[in-house]
């Protein structure tokens, strides 16, 4: 049992190291990375962040296969040259993925029934007040095709999210305003989303900060955006 726990802990550490390098710092760390976000696996394994954990090719294969959010993808070039990428979440500006890794969404028939941005109480207030859901330091806004743990929903929001912003996929403004893509792990990625495309805001659980809740109620009411609790 103890060995299993240690293995799980090590896999979490390796997954975090992979995310850090592939999403954010590959260029800074002078790793080869192409415009789709792929890095040679052998080169990645030589980096100190992975060498510290004595990471092997088998470790990487296991993490890619078993990661519950399918954060990583491996492709093979030639006979045995493997390259790995993070499926989304990048802040590296030189990454401009082709439709090999990001499928352009250009018509309503390509959209799921729901598109939801998961966040928290403090952040949703900032979003409404600023007028848009912004990618912040990342390249895209992340959207999930449903609530956490719903059928077919792998990723797209943090498990700690307790506020859900539903996007109006049927608005005439949707394709006029947004550039939308779908990632390899079925996360929908967008440019900045104006609040005019917010269909409703749903708060989950019993949030105790009544002052912030009152602020949220007020600013949503001012913009005619419904607020629901579940």
From Swiss-Prot:
EC number(s) on file: 2.7.1.160
One BP annotation, GO: tRNA splicing, via endonucleolytic cleavage and ligation
Catalytic activity field: 2'-phospho-[ligated tRNA] + NAD(+) = mature tRNA + ADP-alpha-D-ribose 1'',2''-cyclic phosphate + nicotinamide
InterPro entries xrefs: Ptrans_KptA/Tpt1, RNA_2'-PTrans_C, RNA_2'-PTrans_N
Gene Ontology annotations for the cellular component aspect, listed alphabetically: cytoplasm; nucleus
GO molecular function: tRNA 2'-phosphotransferase activity
UniProt keyword list: NAD, Transferase, tRNA processing
Miscellaneous note of the record: Present with 672 molecules/cell in log phase SD medium.
Protein family per UniProt: Belongs to the KptA/TPT1 family.
Known role: Catalyzes the last step of tRNA splicing, the transfer of the splice junction 2'-phosphate from ligated tRNA to NAD to produce ADP-ribose 1''-2'' cyclic phosphate.
PANTHER family per UniProt: PUTATIVE PHOSPHOTRANSFERASE, TRNA 2'-PHOSPHOTRANSFERASE 1
Name this protein carries in UniProt: tRNA 2'-phosphotransferase
Organism: Saccharomyces cerevisiae (strain ATCC 204508 / S288c) (Baker's yeast)
């Amino acid at each position: 049992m103890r060995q299993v726990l240690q293995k799980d802990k090590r896999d979490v550490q390796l997954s975090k190291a992979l995310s850090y390098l592939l999403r954010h710092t590959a260029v800074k760390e002078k790793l080869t990375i192409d415009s789709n976000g792929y890095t040679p696996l052998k080169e990645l394994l030589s980096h100190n962040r992975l060498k510290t954990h004595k990471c092997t090719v088998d470790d990487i294969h296991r993490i890619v296969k078993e990661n519950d959010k399918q954060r990583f993808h491996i492709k093979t070039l030639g006979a045995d040259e493997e390259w790995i990428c993070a499926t989304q979440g990048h802040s590296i500006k030189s990454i401009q993925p082709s439709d090999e890794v990001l499928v352009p969404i250009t018509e309503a028939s390509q959209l799921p029934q729901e598109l939801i941005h998961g966040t928290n109480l403090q952040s949703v207030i900032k979003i409404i007040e600023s007028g848009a859901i912004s990618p912040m330091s990342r390249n895209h806004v992340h959207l999930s095709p449903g609530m956490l743990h719903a059928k077919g929903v792998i990723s797209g929001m943090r498990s700690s999210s307790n506020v859900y912003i539903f996007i109006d996929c049927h608005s005439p403004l949707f394709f006029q305003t947004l550039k939308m893509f779908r990632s390899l792990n079925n996360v929908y990625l967008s440019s900045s989303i104006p609040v005019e495309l917010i269909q409703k805001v749903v708060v989950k659980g019993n949030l105790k900060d009544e002052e912030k809740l009152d602020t949220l109620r007020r600013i949503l009411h001012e913009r005619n955006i419904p607020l629901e609790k579940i």
